[in-house]
Amino acid sequence: MSDWLFDLGNSRFKFAPLQGDRAGDVQAWAHGAEGMAGQPPHSLPSGTTAFVASVAAPSLTSAMLDQLQRRFEHVHVVRTSAECAGVRIAYAKPEKFGVDRFLALLAAAKAQRPVLVVGVGTALTIDLLDANGQHHGGRISASPTTMREALHARAVQLPATGGDYSEFANDTADALASGCDGAAVALIERSAQQAHALLGVAPSLLVHGGGAPALMPLLPGADYHPSLVLDGLARWAVHQPAG
């Protein structure tokens, strides 16, 4: 029997075996939580313990937990705490801090260096962690994908997808891609500058999330870590009391 990690996001459901204090090979359902009910039972693993993180709607989270409870002896759902694995969250009310951001910080803290953690999903999240595991707070904005969708919803003639980044675009699709990606990059760069001023040292830049690959060419020196949240969930799992 084995232990598994499950990450239910707003757009994707990912899972991987727990291997030491990290995630093993990751599997993903790109269609997200809504498609879980249509998956055949053998699509999900079974084992001893399931460690679960979810930022999805309560109804979808409940549906996932129902399936996992049929396949695992124990199911543990992560909640953000003020301190875990040497990481101390800056929020006065840690329960208000998103569990995906919390787990990303747990994974990032393993390197024991200042780091700016950037998540690019439905939202763009930016969090600063120092070398001692102290979280210094962060920012939340719309991701480029969400910006495009919002513009299209208000002005249907503006395409929700397509286009390539250009510093000065000469067509609408490219201008939209450039503006939305550029806005995200500008916020990340501003955060990195302010982090340097605060800590006295430039933090490394760690990027994760489904929208991250589109931004990586615009962020020289950044590291892309697609399994960051699952790796953080693994660290959370191994720091739980036995039993």
From Swiss-Prot:
It holds the Pfam family Pan_kinase. It is found in: Cytoplasm. Pathway: Cofactor biosynthesis; coenzyme A biosynthesis; CoA from (R)-pantothenate: step 1/5. InterPro entries: ATPase_NBD, Type_III_PanK. Its main location: cytoplasm. Substrate binds at Y91, G98, V99, D100, R101, T172. It comes from the Bacteria. Keywords: ATP-binding, Coenzyme A biosynthesis, Cytoplasm, Kinase, Nucleotide-binding, Potassium, Transferase. Its EC number is 2.7.1.33. Disulfide bonds: none annotated. The active site is at D100. A monovalent cation. Ammonium or potassium. ATP binds at D7, L8, G9, N10, S11, R12, F13, K14, T122. SUPFAM superfamilies: Actin-like ATPase domain. It catalyses: (R)-pantothenate + ATP = (R)-4'-phosphopantothenate + ADP + H(+). GO terms for molecular function: ATP binding; pantothenate kinase activity. One of its GO terms (cellular component) is cytoplasm. One of its GO terms (biological process) is coenzyme A biosynthetic process. PANTHER family: TYPE III PANTOTHENATE KINASE. NCBIfam families: baf (TIGR00671), PRK13327.1 (NF009864). Catalyzes the phosphorylation of pantothenate (Pan), the first step in CoA biosynthesis. Belongs to the type III pantothenate kinase family. This is Type III pantothenate kinase. It comes from Stenotrophomonas maltophilia (strain R551-3). The gene is coaX.
